[in-house]
């Protein structure tokens, strides 16, 4: 099987970003975004998805974290789309439930070519440290739009906001791993009755 890797650069007046991914990696990471809690969550995607991630971003953090978080989502989505290619031979669908103490989240993803996000996370507070948790909606929307996936995220229970978010990102990584995994019974075939995705 060909290497499923990609490197994407995206430069705007708000951010300068470079993202490299290896879908068949071991969870190696290197991050330089200037947003530590965000990097902690990106690490969950890589470690639990066994996806190598290298992400650099110079953003307008003097304003706030919004553009950095959203634009990393966009660029990561573009990198996934490029790395996965025509989607032949993949499982396509992935899902995961992940607990952390009192918190439990479920994530379901479909590499359908149809971007859509349903995200239900009733955060118990607005910030973790200085990080605005609403920005994770922007991250996932950016990813969904540019990876061309359908993504359902549900935090089923939890009272600690850090735990709620961490279970979401761990489940997201595991769902991605399942969806992009090569299916030995679908070699060379598109996992759709339409014949294309």
Curated annotation (Swiss-Prot):
EC number: 4.2.1.19
Gene Ontology annotations for the cellular component aspect, listed alphabetically: cytoplasm
PROSITE patterns given in the database record: IGP_DEHYDRATASE_1, IGP_DEHYDRATASE_2
GO MF term list: imidazoleglycerol-phosphate dehydratase activity
Subcellular location: Cytoplasm
InterPro entries: IGPD_sf, ImidazoleglycerolP_deHydtase, ImidazoleglycerP_deHydtase_CS, Ribosomal_Su5_D2-typ_SF
Record pathway: Amino-acid biosynthesis; L-histidine biosynthesis; L-histidine from 5-phospho-alpha-D-ribose 1-diphosphate: step 6/9
Predominant cellular place of this UniProt entry's protein: cytoplasm
Keyword vocabulary terms for this entry: Amino-acid biosynthesis, Cytoplasm, Histidine biosynthesis, Lyase
Gene Ontology biological-process annotations: L-histidine biosynthetic process
Catalytic activity from the UniProt record: D-erythro-1-(imidazol-4-yl)glycerol 3-phosphate = 3-(imidazol-4-yl)-2-oxopropyl phosphate + H2O
Superkingdom, natural source: Bacteria
Classification via PANTHER family: IMIDAZOLEGLYCEROL-PHOSPHATE DEHYDRATASE, IMIDAZOLEGLYCEROL-PHOSPHATE DEHYDRATASE HIS7
Family recorded in the similarity comment: Belongs to the imidazoleglycerol-phosphate dehydratase family.
The protein's name: Imidazoleglycerol-phosphate dehydratase
Gene name in the database record: hisB
